[in-house]
Amino acid sequence: NKIKMNHIKTMLCGHFIGIDKLERLKLLQNDPLVNEFDISVKEPETVSRFLGNFNFKTTQMFRDINFKVFKKLLTKSKLTSITIDIDSSVINVEGHQEGASKGYNPKKLGNRCYNIQFAFCDELKAYVTGFVRSGNTYTANGAAEMIKEIVANIKSDDLEILFRMDSGYFDEKI
């Protein structure tokens, strides 16, 4: 179980530096900050096998751990006000990956894609949360739920949270 927790910590570190390929986890192998937290970064192939076993429950566990890490970072910062930016991005795929579909894809018109929705804290330059959606998903879909989840996980009496989104997120629910 310690190995699996180490893989999760490795993935969180990858999220925080914005990796786009598991191969880039190697950039963390000799990082002093990663070593300070006693995280042994495994080979990308090992992490890939680990991720292949994920289901909804383990994905939710990963999200919960990420919120705990972000909350610790936020607490250490002693900020009393933060801005959370919510946005989406299209990830082009080749072939017929599960969940990918044709949608708004400016990179390759007509190709199947995923539509990733994510939230970052502007002041800390840190990833807060996010999830993968089908390529044909409307920009604002899931944003209200994401805002509720963020507030439920990080809100405190001495913290003011401002959410910032572009006009694609205009929706009565938000």
Predicted feature residues:
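Short, basic interhelical loop/turn and adjoining N-cap
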Residues: 30-49
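Short, charged amphipathic recognition helices of the HTH superfamily
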Residues: 17-30
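Basic, short loop/linker segments at the boundary and entry of helix-turn-helix/winged-helix-like folds
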Residues: 1-9, 141
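Electropositive, glycine- and tryptophan-enriched low-complexity nucleic-acid-binding patches
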Residues: 106-156
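Alpha-helix capping and helix-loop boundary segments enriched in small/acidic/polar residues
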Residues: 38, 131-142, 162-169
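Short, conserved catalytic/metal-binding motifs centered on acidic residues
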Residues: 10-11, 25, 43, 47, ...
